[in-house]
Amino acid sequence: PAMHEYVADLESWYEDLQELTPKSWFRLEDVPNEGPFIVKGKTNSRKDRWKNLMYAENKEEAINISCELMCDPLLSKQGIVVRKYEPLVTFDEDVSGRPVTEEFRYFCLDGKILARGYYWSNFSDSLKDAGIYPDFSEEADQLVLRALEKIKGKIRFVVVDVAKTVEGKWIVIELNDGCMSGTSDVPLEELYDNLYKGLVDENILENNLV
């Protein structure tokens, strides 16, 4: 379906959200020499190999990673994109060395926020024990609403991932199909209750955030 194709291809939604998300290049010849960069498929990435198949210090490394990803059975069918690496507020790192950041996942329907939660659910307990589990941000909420307005009519049920940079700015990291996304730390009862209400009675979501 057109809605899934739109949200599953970064190049499709990038034009609508380029003011809110990291600079991206879809042709290697357009990538500047100075990095760092993130290299991924237009839909998926090799997060499990962050240090050698996702993060690139410069254009040469980005090209080398792109060549490897073009041989990947899944990513080669999507096309490869190079994105500007934005340093994010970081609490830890996962087993691949990928930064565990101040990032949230939002489930949204028809331009309204249904529910939101911390993205890195595998680290929730350790961050809570350390007293650094992040709180929700009004600024992040407003960013999501701006993004939803810009993609209005393109997709109904969408996931928006946002994160905070070290400079204190919130940015859109990714869009995903709401039907195919993990729930992270999003409260399930709240999500499914509001999703049901939104589908049964579109007038029940009177506010931007239930």
Regions found by a protein language model. Name each.
Residues 108-112, 165-168:
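Short acidic-glycine loop/turn motifs at beta-strand connectors
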Residues 2-103, 110, 115-116, 120-146:
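Active-site nucleotide/adenylate-binding loops and adjacent lid/helix of ATP-dependent enzymes
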Residues 98-101, 153-157:
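Short solvent-exposed loop/turn micro-motifs enriched in small/polar/acidic residues
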Residues 103-105, 159-161:
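Short, surface-exposed charged micro-motifs
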Residues 138, 150-155, 164-210:
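C-terminal active-site "lid" helix and adjoining low-complexity regulatory extension at the edge
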Residues 38, 157-160:
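A short linear hydrophobic-aromatic micro-motif
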